[in-house]
């Protein structure tokens, strides 16, 4: 199957047409979901959008559908937030304040957090963990903390990222559950900055605007253990990349992560804006690692893109991408 994948890459025009058919086919599944309703600015997206971008270590890029449509990272930013914090403070320091265990609960749930004796967030991929991690970034002010992340993104993408102000303000004004999480974390001693400062950083990261090409590139770097094969630079250490991919596999698709791992088997992270970032490691010398970026704003009850997950499942089976 790996040879088949390479053969497909050698016939890029044919593959592009096949992927266009797949995108158009799975686009119809968007009707089975809806755009995120609890963030007003996200309700306005066209729920029939579906875009795909695939980038390989050898430089081959394949795109299809609405791949150029901009969207905000939302929870995909938790990956970058975690990496930046590990670079700033070290893995040990970060993991002293946030765990690596799946929860099986909704991403914004407080239930298990309150039941846990220590109050330590379960993992960096849920809101409580991500808000905690945002408070760990180096710098005193939100602006200084955000610079750690913006600098990392610039190294990965080769350009300066920016946040969508309308989305940021939309989230800030409706942040009641996240505020309660942050105050609880402050009370238990895990939040290292003031509540409003941590939330400002967190919501700004969620509002960073990207397209499928951008998250595919970040996925490629993760797939190559922090190394960018296109710029030939080690962006972050292998240890950080491996830990991040483990978290993506076990916690990256909200409380559908187990099903996703069993049936698709790729380290991935989703966001309620409809984005999915996947990192496909190489499995031998003759194989090429790849990053996959998908955007489909109609999401299911778990917060994952309906059409995006179905499309990624098809690609995983067609190209034998599962790491298992």
From Swiss-Prot:
Molecular function (GO) terms for this protein are:
glutaminase activity
- Annotated Pfam families: Glutaminase (PF04960)
What does the UniProt keyword field contain? Hydrolase
For this protein, the record's SUPFAM superfamilies field holds: beta-lactamase/transpeptidase-like (SSF56601)
Segment forming the signal sequence: none
Q: Which domain of life is it from?
A: Bacteria
Task: Give me the residues that bind substrate, please.
Answer: 75, 127, 171, 178, 202, 254, 272
- Please state the Enzyme Commission number of this protein: 3.5.1.2
Reactions this protein catalyses: L-glutamine + H2O = L-glutamate + NH4(+)
What Gene3D superfamilies does this protein's entry cite? Answer: 1.10.1500.10, DD-peptidase/beta-lactamase superfamily
Spell out the InterPro entries in the cross-references: Beta-lactam/transpept-like, Glutaminase
One GO biological process term is: glutamine catabolic process
What sections of the sequence does the record tag as coiled-coil? Answer: none
Q: How does it assemble?
A: Homotetramer.
Similarity comment: Belongs to the glutaminase family.
Q: Which NCBIfam families match?
A: Gln_ase, PRK12357.1
This protein's name = Glutaminase 2
Organism taxonomic ancestry: Bacteria, Bacillati, Bacillota, Bacilli, Bacillales
